[in-house]
Amino acid sequence: MQSTYFQEATELWNQSLHNSLKVQDRRFSSEAWNSNPVAAFNAATYLLNARTLMGLADAVQGDAKTRNRIRFAVEQWVAAAAPSNFLAFNAEAQKKALDTKGESIAKGVQNLMHDIQQGHVSMTDESLFHVGKNVATTEGAVVFE
């Protein structure tokens, strides 16, 4: 696994020297990622590391339940660590900030302030949901699959 990682990392580096990196992942499908060599290298490096970490998780020996939990935890961590989740590394968000003269950043800060006031992150327009009309409440449990 180590030799494969170093071989792929070397290939990635060599491709970046010739500006021939093309990242094949929906999170990095915007032209902003591929037209910026630093962003493309960052995305490609992330994908290499993500594949390697998932490979390590798959290689864990043990019972199926433990292996599934490890895989799930690593998968969540890897997804959260994607450069598309951070403004400092997100080429598409940076381009939008430039194109909107910072308006997209201001809107994002407004959304953040609203979420802080609510005490949780909004994932959808909560005003569209009303208990008893289009949302039911029942007791339940979290199920790990």
Where are these regions (language model features)?
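Amphipathic, low-complexity, repeat-rich surface-exposed segments
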Residues: 1-145
